[in-house]
């Protein structure tokens, strides 16, 4: 797999002549399983084949159950300078419902260590979860803001057919999704993000003003998005950078 990605990096280089790479994003949920050496091989390939700006933002996507303290320390000693962590919720019942591998304690412990060794952290939070009320959503946001994360990607829960959660809802084990409740969660999110000093980049994507001021100069221009081996496409800041190199 790594050989194939490196090969495509080399083959696609001519498609981006004259462009500069400003952001490198290792996505897909589990790139944290790669060793520092394996990550560095791909980063070195990008530097060799593309024009990379000085001090680019290099993000690694990971789940809390993969980010032990030792692993976070290892990553802080690599070229990675930003973590994107799939927290989803700080409430155990929510995590169990969504069949997440981590629990609330692991989520908070992960962020505690991550904020000690990284100063640029993004987390995912999900709202509109069956049974979630404004109080628990407020508690989720309060916890995130208290950790001082400077980027939050927040999404309304969607339930795909033939999934375990879909079956549980059909059987009445969990209440169905409520669009009105999700709307209330979204409105509360907007209020809280303003109070916390975060700016809305796109609906549901919040960044600290310091990060926002860094990238706002390019908002509005059409940019290239390059996606390699992802199950889904990340659009975060896609209109604010020259090339958004995603691995």
Residue ranges and their predicted role:
Residues 1-15, 19-247:
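C-terminal scaffold of the Radical SAM
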């Amino acid at each position: 797999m790594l050989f194939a990605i490196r090969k495509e990096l080399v083959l696609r280089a001519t498609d981006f002549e004259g462009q500069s790479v400003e952001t490198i994003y290792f996505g897909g949920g589990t790139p944290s399983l790669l060793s520092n050496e394996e990550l560095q091989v791909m980063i070195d390939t990008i530097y060799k084949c593309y024009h990379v700006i000085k001090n680019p933002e290099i993000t690694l996507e990971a789940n809390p159950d993969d980010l032990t303290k030792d692993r976070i320390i290892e990553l802080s000693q690599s070229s990675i300078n930003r973590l994107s962590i799939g927290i989803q919720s700080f409430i155990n019942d929510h995590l169990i419902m969504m069949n997440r591998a981590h629990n609330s304690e692991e989520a908070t412990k992960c962020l505690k260590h991550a904020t000690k060794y990284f100063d640029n952290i993004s987390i995912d939070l999900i709202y509109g979860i069956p049974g979630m009320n404004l109080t628990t959503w407020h508690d989720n946001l309060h916890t995130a803001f208290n950790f001082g994360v400077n980027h939050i990607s927040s999404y309304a829960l969607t339930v795909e057919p033939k999934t375990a959660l879909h079956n549980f809802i059909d059987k009445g084990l969990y209440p169905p999704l409520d669009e009105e409740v999700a709307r209330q969660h979204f409105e509360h999110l907007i209020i809280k993000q303003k109070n916390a000093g975060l700016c809305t980049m796109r609906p549901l994507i919040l960044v600290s003003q310091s990060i926002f001021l860094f990238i706002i100069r390019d908002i509005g221009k059409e940019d290239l998005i390059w996606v390699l081996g992802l199950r889904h496409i990340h659009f975060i800041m896609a209109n604010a950078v020259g090339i958004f190199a995603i691995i």
